[in-house]
Swiss-Prot record:
Keyword rRNA-binding (UniProt): yes
Function: Acts as a ribosome collision sensor. Detects stalled/collided disomes (pairs of ribosomes where the leading ribosome is stalled and a second ribosome has collided with it) and endonucleolytically cleaves mRNA at the 5' boundary of the stalled ribosome. Stalled/collided disomes form a new interface (primarily via the 30S subunits) that binds SmrB. Cleaved mRNA becomes available for tmRNA ligation, leading to ribosomal subunit dissociation and rescue of stalled ribosomes.
Phylogenetic classification of the source organism: Bacteria, Pseudomonadati, Pseudomonadota, Gammaproteobacteria, Enterobacterales
Assembly description: Associates with collided ribosomes, but not with correctly translating polysomes.
GO MF entry, a single one: RNA endonuclease activity
Smr domain location: 98-173
Keywords: Endonuclease, Hydrolase, Nuclease, RNA-binding, rRNA-binding
GO biological process: rescue of stalled ribosome
Enzyme Commission code: 3.1.-.-
Protein name: Ribosome rescue factor SmrB
Pfam families membership: Smr (PF01713)
Homology family: Belongs to the SmrB family.
Length: 183
């Protein structure tokens, strides 16, 4: 900090002489703080419940029967197989992306559960999960976990523009969801 310089007696007298006849201005301006909108936060209890639900659905012991030939795909029994075809063709473009690179299996399960919960909360029906090539651990496990979740309607190996065989496009069941009209 700079030291305050003191004025000499002469300078102080000169200042008083120059300021004679002036009066102090009264500050009457009121400054209003801008009103900020409250951002609706997801309650902590709900987040904890979503995480618990996510870990509940993904089991390592249960192995759903998935087709091992050709690209990785799955369609829930009550969903039309045409939805998988639309995923394959790229008719659906994902709105949320999840990159699992570098995560452990436990972290990947938690992130998958969080992605599905976020999709349902935000009414996003298509997401992309990038599991990568790596050591093939997450590449093998990710489809098995997704097939176990009741809100996953279908998934298919992603088209090249979304990651090809290192990613999956996932169709999530959202409340009041209707497939979009094709042009």
């Amino acid at each position: 900090m700079k030291k305050k310089t003191t004025l000499s007696e002469e300078d102080q007298a000169l200042f008083r002489q120059l300021m004679a006849g002036t009066r102090k201005i009264k500050q009457d301006t009121i400054v209003h703080r801008p009103q900020r909108k409250k951002i609706s936060e997801v309650p902590v209890k709900r987040l904890i419940q979503e995480q618990a639900d996510a870990s509940h659905y993904f089991s390592d012991e249960f192995q759903p029967l998935l087709n091992t030939e050709g690209p990785v795909k799955y369609v829930r029994p009550d969903v039309s197989h045409f939805e998988a075809k639309k995923l394959r063709r790229g008719d659906y473009s994902p709105e949320l992306f999840l990159d699992l690179h570098g995560l452990t299996q436990l972290q990947a399960k938690q992130e998958l559960g969080a992605l599905i919960a976020a999709c349902r909360r935000e009414h996003v029906f298509c997401a992309c999960v990038m599991h990568g090539h790596g050591k093939h651990i997450l590449k093998q496990q990710t489809p098995l976990w997704l097939a176990q979740h009741p809100h996953v309607m279908a998934f298919h190996q992603a088209p090249k523009e979304y990651g090809g065989d290192a990613a999956l496009l996932v169709l999530i069941e959202v409340d009041e969801w209707l497939p979009p009209e094709l042009p």
